[in-house]
Amino acid sequence: MPGPMNKRDLEPGIITDLAGRTTYGDYLQLDRLLSAQVTRSQPPHHDELLFIIQHQTSELWMKLLIHELGACIRYVQADRLEPSFKIFARVAHIQRMLFEQWSVLETLTPNEYLEFRDTLGSSSGFQSFQYRAVEFLLGNKDAQALMPFRHVPAIHGELERLFESPSLYDEFLRHLSRMGHPVPQSHVQRDWRKPYEKSPEVVEVFRRIYQDAEAHWDAYEMCEKLVDTEERFQLWRYRHMMTVMRIIGFKQGTGGSSGVGFLRKALDLRFFPELWDVRTELTPPPPRHRP
């Protein structure tokens, strides 16, 4: 017979004596994690906790994003595109978490934020080393972006390593070259620290792949995964800009930037320019013979 409503008895096998065992809190180090939300406003402002958690959770998702993009790069280096497609599916969900959670911060009104904004000092999202790592992994290389991290040698060193290494897009072009596609040598071996310069020859490589997708299915699928990734990244940038505009208008950013104006310029940046340009070059396929 069913038991009383709103009551669920513990099953006999559920462990309740946790002395000497690894617990949920132990495994996740919740004592450290949950003690990291330290407000600075005096007296503590109710909404400062929201602001801190918004950014800390973003950093956690970016840590996972870096982990997954690194795995993608290793698969591409090994000429194994297919296993990377599953990772891209996960990357898609991580990115959605990142840009959809801006809606939580948007519940912060301008006057509420102004009541504790001064406690941020000169801190700014531009100083997020993990965000910078994601940009480097995807190919947006800018030596000036390393400057805010010079005072932390370990972080600066890791970012410098990514800055000097081929990006995901670079590795994909190198893979296509190994597969026999006529990628220009200037895009197979170059100074990876320099900003990427798009090439009409690379557009032509992609045009051939798109015009005969069945013959180049893995490469075609990879092209679309990269476009998906960049589109979602642009959505993140846009939501960031709109959230800032909604909360502070056109005030200067805490880190010294112009604020919304600086964020708007990022919308013009492209990670994979030829994958966007090729869409203009595509023509209708020839009619298929029907028996």
Curated annotation (Swiss-Prot):
Catalytic activity: L-tryptophan + O2 = N-formyl-L-kynurenine
Signal peptide: none
Task of the protein: Heme-dependent dioxygenase that catalyzes the oxidative cleavage of the L-tryptophan (L-Trp) pyrrole ring and converts L-tryptophan to N-formyl-L-kynurenine. Catalyzes the oxidative cleavage of the indole moiety.
Keyword ATP-binding: no
Required cofactor names: heme
Binding annotation for heme: 240
Gene name tied to this protein: kynA
A molecular function (GO) term: metal ion binding
Family: Belongs to the tryptophan 2,3-dioxygenase family.
Subunit details: Homotetramer.
Official protein name in the record: Tryptophan 2,3-dioxygenase
Binding site for substrate: 51-55, 113, 117, 254
UniProt cross-references to InterPro entries, sorted A to Z: Trp/Indoleamine_2_3_dOase-like, Trp_2_3_dOase
